[in-house]
């Protein structure tokens, strides 16, 4: 039977929370198979905390991410990642965007690094973007390229110094040494740590 993405999402959400593991896996498999469109659709249902409850939608997105990070279902991962990235860009609520970033960090790849790095200067999302970049394998080249840019803010230097430490990136040492000259106390502390 041919069901639309809208129908699959509505049917899946109606079954949550799942009664047991079998139902959970079936629902998550169906939702994950809707790909980017389904993920974006569910993410669009998230509302600011003062406007309603997001538990079912967060449960669904978290479940889909967990489902596609299982090696048995990895073929569905790319479309889910793309949906999360698009949802982050479209979402207007910072807390919900932070939640979406927290999910992205479980399934992101190095191909997503530039999209995540765009948020490093966002006052609310910088920490979430940074954690996603740090937890994503293969982002070292992008982080080094970011460090080589002119006119980096102190906040950006602190974020990059943290990322370099977390990734144990020895190639970043020349940047860190250069940044120490004239660094404010917070930046110097992050570089030394």
Features from the language model and the residues they span:
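Short, solvent-exposed linear motifs at loop/edge-of-secondary-structure regions
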Residues: 22-25, 29, 33, 106, ...
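Amphipathic alpha-helical scaffolding segments comprising HEAT/armadillo-like alpha-solenoid repeats
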Residues: 1-15, 36-48, 70-89, 98, ...
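Long amphipathic alpha-helical scaffold regions
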Residues: 51-68, 127-159, 185-193
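Residue-level detector of extended alpha-helical repeat arrays and alpha-solenoid scaffolds
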Residues: 21-24, 39, 53-58, 97, ...
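Charged, low-complexity interaction regions
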Residues: 18-23, 92, 152
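Alpha-helical solenoid scaffolds in large eukaryotic transport, assembly, and signaling factors
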Residues: 24-59, 63-76
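Core register positions within helices of long alpha-helical scaffolds
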Residues: 30-33, 59-67, 100-106, 132-135, ...
């Amino acid at each position: 039977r041919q069901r639309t993405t809208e129908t699959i999402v509505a049917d899946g959400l109606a079954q949550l929370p799942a009664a047991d593991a079998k139902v959970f896996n079936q629902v998550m498999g169906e939702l994950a198979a809707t790909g980017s469109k389904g993920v974006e659709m569910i993410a669009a249902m998230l509302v600011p905390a003062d406007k309603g409850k997001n538990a079912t939608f967060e449960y669904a997105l978290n479940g889909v991410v967990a489902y596609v990070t299982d090696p048995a279902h990895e073929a569905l991962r790319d479309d889910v990642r793309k949906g999360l990235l698009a949802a982050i860009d479209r979402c207007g609520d910072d807390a919900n965007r932070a939640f979406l970033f927290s999910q992205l960090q479980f399934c992101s790849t190095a191909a997503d690094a530039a999209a995540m790095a765009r948020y490093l200067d966002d006052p609310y999302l910088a920490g979430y973007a940074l954690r996603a970049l740090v937890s994503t394998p293969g982002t070292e080249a992008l982080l080094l390229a970011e460090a080589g840019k002119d006119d980096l803010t102190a906040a950006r230097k602190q974020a990059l110094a943290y990322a370099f430490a977390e990734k144990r990136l020895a190639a970043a040492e020349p940047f860190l040494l250069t940044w120490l000259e004239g660094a404010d106390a917070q930046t110097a502390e992050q570089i030394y740590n």
